UniProtKB/Swiss-Prot annotation:
It is found in: Cell membrane. GO terms for molecular function: actin filament binding; ATP binding; microfilament motor activity. This is Myosin-A. It comes from the Eukaryota. It is a peripheral membrane protein. Pfam families: Myosin_head. Residues 663-673 are annotated as: Actin-binding. Belongs to the TRAFAC class myosin-kinesin ATPase superfamily. Myosin family. GO terms for cellular component: cytoplasm; myosin complex; plasma membrane.
Length: 831
């Protein structure tokens, strides 16, 4: 195996194995079924390479019903038998060709090793798309497979019967577009996955599909503006991370007006959860947002002089250890962004303002807020000397009044009634205010660019129905999870509720259509975890907001409040390690530990009302619009300023929008961290399959009557239970299926017959498999006799056919011997 997970990831993956299968390798007589195979995590190769997770083995004769005696067969090269307890054995999908199955849920066994093996076989043969209905799983191949060309778009767009084509992002796009116009209801395609899994690429390909109109008569100006905006959004919202060289650091929801025959008529973009802290600092192997590097490398001499652009290594907000990103040409992308600005119809003055603000944000980082003695404070904030010169340049680039901003960063103003009280900020407070200004200017500039785009692409009368596209991170579980992961995981819990509701609705509809009782369908809701995370009272977010606004609030007090308010729930737990600062949330995907240190600081957008007023009064029209419409109260934080309340309000609006649509799900998965083709790490795959609810989708299908097959497929699969029923031409398929089930003596509560298919509970399907296995096993002696009999008859027939040739050969040999006067007795055998 070419790459490995970290020890922490391997530990997580190992914990996700869950219980083993109900394996039946031995018949009632104590004999092992011939050729019976299992998966196990105790195989020699797994001990040598834990990332492998499972290996395939064949069960040997001599096995009892307790432990299984096995020999590993895949990977090969291990011939020594070893013992496997039943608790470490999983069933194998024998005689199954993964390339003929588009849906994982149709496999006989959907345990974890079977799912991993199924996906691996398809991945290694370049089939990166698979269905786990209602999800489409897309595995990043880290290379161009040539399966997203215009020819492929046309194939999926123009086919009459879409069901005959393999899973693909174009399949999802076509189905969503058909539904949009057939039922006149808005659709949403939700694309999720961890950084580097291919979300951005999948979203781009879906956009290309929608843009590919059958006719060329439509106005392409708006479509071109939407497509051209992608480089700008990526430049301002994407960055190089350890996991991905082009990682989206924000969530994006797009609304598109797509024609019945394709082509994008209008659109709108909503961005949320931009990672503002990246503007200030980056980890050792990471970069800030692409736009900073594009500007510094791509600007000509005149532009550098005009906007005071320095070499990248001279900026304190830029990590000097990582100035380049593999596969990214910053200079070429700078020119692409400039071209995109023109396509978005930005004026020359607006473009100049954008570059000025970007440069000003970087230069503001070079301003050091120093400590001085003043007003009885030993470490009063000050900006003076050379720092003042740099500060004035930065404020000039940001189109802000330098003297007024300097005063707000150093002089503390509070109010007692109508009386103004002036003092000094401490050095650390002044530095925090400066950092908040830099983050806020960048964040609001990003939002302004999106607003400009929307003004040019929105439909004049609003959307009647729309095609939605949500590009969002999946559940994030790191070694150290902070407020960013907390917000991301709240978002995913909301999406998970939507997902479960969809699965339940689809299952219920199938049962109704088939005339089958759905009383067996009982799904588990995540409503409780959402409540303890986001409720107005007695929730984690409520406690965080209260502590942020309370005098003397702290991370420790926030955590203490949570413990007191939520002690009656099982979804919030103190951590075993450092419980004074860590806490656990029982999310849908399992327990996730959060570190509360820094929660309050990150939740406070401490850009004070007085500073926002200065920004709003800027003479530059772009800057003046950045904080337009924000309600302010001097001496206090602006209303709605806390990140948590902004996030929750935005999320609730987003969920209302999505819940009004019919959703489709694409789960993007990264098979390795090396970003190399054909490199497959099972432990990494397992973590993502769990975090993206792929395994849960399969589990949900196991509820109620989890097995459902058309009558003919059912008869073919279980025909040996009763050949007189399955092979009877006088019975229609439904009658034959019922007779076979009666012959099996399967309890009636284990199955129902619908209009076109058989429905079996999971236990019933396993019982039928066992019954058929025992039938075949009991026939084995007879089969052996018949095989020997027919082999003998076949040999005799072949011999009889050859007899004339043998007699003729003998005659020729005898004649040869006589002609040469050779006695037969002198001829020596040749063996």
């Amino acid at each position: 195996m070419a790459s490995k997970t970290t020890s922490e990831e391997l530990k997580t993956a190992t914990a996700l194995k869950k219980r083993s299968s109900d394996v039946h390798a031995v018949d009632h007589s104590g004999n092992v079924y011939k050729g019976f195979q299992i998966w196990t995590d105790l195989a020699p190769s797994v001990k040598e390479e834990p990332d492998l997770m499972f290996a395939k083995c064949i069960v040997q004769a001599g096995t009892d019903k307790g432990n299984l005696t096995c020999v590993q067969i895949d990977p090969p090269g291990f011939d020594e038998p070893f013992e496997v307890p039943q608790a470490n054995a999983w069933n194998v999908n024998s005689l199954i060709d993964p390339m003929t199955y588009g849906d994982i849920g149709m496999l006989p066994h959907t345990n974890i090793p079977c799912v991993l093996d199924f996906l691996k076989v398809r991945f290694m043969k370049n089939q990166i798309y698979t269905t786990a209905d209602p999800l489409v799983v897309a595995i990043n191949p880290f290379r161009d497979l040539g399966n997203t060309t215009l020819d492929w778009i046309v194939r999926y767009r123009d086919t009459f019967d879409l069901s005959k084509l393999a899973p693909h992002v174009f399949y999802t796009a076509r189905r969503a577009l058909d539904n949009l116009h057939a039922v006149n209801k808005s659709q949403t395609i939700i694309v999720s996955g961890e950084s580097g899994a291919g979300k951005t690429e999948a979203t781009k390909q879906i956009m290309r599909y929608f843009a590919a109109a059958k006719t060329g008569s439509m106005d392409l100006r708006i479509q071109n503006a939407i497509m051209a905006a992608n480089p700008v959004l990526e430049a301002f919202g994407n960055a190089k991370t350890i996991r991905n060289n082009n990682s989206s650091r924000f969530g994006r929801f797009m609304q598109l007006d797509v024609g019945r025959e394709g082509g994008i008529k209008f659109g709108s973009v909503v961005a949320f959860l931009l990672e503002k802290s990246r503007v200030l600092t980056q980890d050792e192997q990471e970069r800030s947002y692409h736009i900073f590097y594009q500007m510094c490398k791509g600007a000509d001499a005149a532009m550098k002089e005009r906007f005071h652009i320095l070499p990248l290594s001279e900026y304190k907000y830029i990590n000097p250890l990582c100035l380049d990103a593999p596969g990214i040409d910053d200079v070429a992308e700078f020119h692409e962004v400039c071209e995109s600005f023109r396509s978005m119809n930005l004026t020359e003055d607006e473009v100049a303002s954008v570059w000025s603000i970007v440069s000003g944000v970087l230069l503001l980082g070079n301003v050091e807020v120093t400590a001085t003695k003043d007003g009885g404070i030993d470490d009063a904030a000050a900006i003076e000397g050379k720092n003042l010169e740099v500060f004035k340049k930065a404020c000039g680039l940001l189109f802000l009044d330098a003297e007024r901003i300097r005063e707000e960063l150093t002089v503390k103003v509070s109010y007692a009634g109508n009386q103004e009280i002036r003092g000094r900020w401490k050095q650390e407070d002044g530095d925090m205010l400066k950092s908040s200004l830099a983050k806020a200017m960048y964040d609001k500039l990003f939002m302004w660019i999106i607003a400009v785009l929307n003004r040019s692409i929105k439909p004049p009368g609003g959307f009647k129905i729309f095609m939605g596209m949500l590009d969002i991170f999946g559940f994030e579980v790191f070694k150290n999870n902070s407020l960013e992961q907390f917000f991301i995981n709240i978002t995913n819990e909301m999406l998970q509720k939507n997902f479960v509701d969809i699965v339940f609705d689809r299952e219920s509809k199938l049962y109704r259509d088939e005339g089958v009782s759905s009383k067996e369908l009982i799904f588990t809701s995540n409503a409780e975890v959402i409540k303890i995370l986001t409720a107005k009272n007695n929730s984690v977010l409520a406690a965080l907001e209260d502590q942020c606004l309370a005098p003397g609030g702290s991370d420790e007090k926030f955590l203490s409040t949570c413990k007191n308010a939520l002690k009656g729930t099982t979804k919030f737990k103190p951590a075993k390690v450092s419980p004074n600062i860590n806490f656990l949330i029982s999310h849908t995907v399992g327990d996730i530990q959060y570190n509360a240190e820094g929660f309050l600081f990150k939740n406070k957008d401490v850009l004070r009302a007085e500073i926002m007023e200065i920004v709003q009064q800027s003479k530059n029209p772009v800057v003046a619009q950045l904080f337009a419409g924000i309600v302010m109260e001097k001496g206090k934080m602006a209303k709605g300023q806390l990140i948590g309340s902004q996030f929750l309000s935005q999320l609730q609006s987003l969920m209302e929008l999505i819940n009004s649509t019919e959703p489709h799900f694409i789960r993007c998965i990264k098979p390795n961290d090396t970003k190399k083709p054909l490199d497959w790490v099972p432990s990494k795959m397992l973590i993502q399959l769990h975090a993206l609810s792929v395994l849960e989708a399969l589990q949900l299908r196991q509820l109620g009557y989890s097995y459902r097959r058309p009558f003919k497929e059912f008869l073919f699969q279980f025909k040996f239970i009763d050949l007189s029923a399955s092979e009877n031409p006088n019975l229609d398929p439904k009658e034959a299926a019922l007779r076979l089930l009666k012959s099996s003596k399967l309890p009636s509560e284990e199955y129902q017959l619908g209009k076109t298919m058989v429905f079996l509970k999971q236990t019933g399907a396993k019982e039928l498999t066992q019954i058929q296995r025992e039938c075949l096993s009991s026939w084995e002696p007879l089969v052996s006799v018949l095989e020997a009999y027919y082999a003998g008859r076949r040999h005799k027939k072949q011999l009889l056919k050859k007899t004339p040739f043998i007699i003729r050969a003998q005659a020729h040999i005898r004649r040869h011997l006589v002609d040469n006067n050779v006695s037969p007795a002198t001829v020596q055998p040749a063996f």
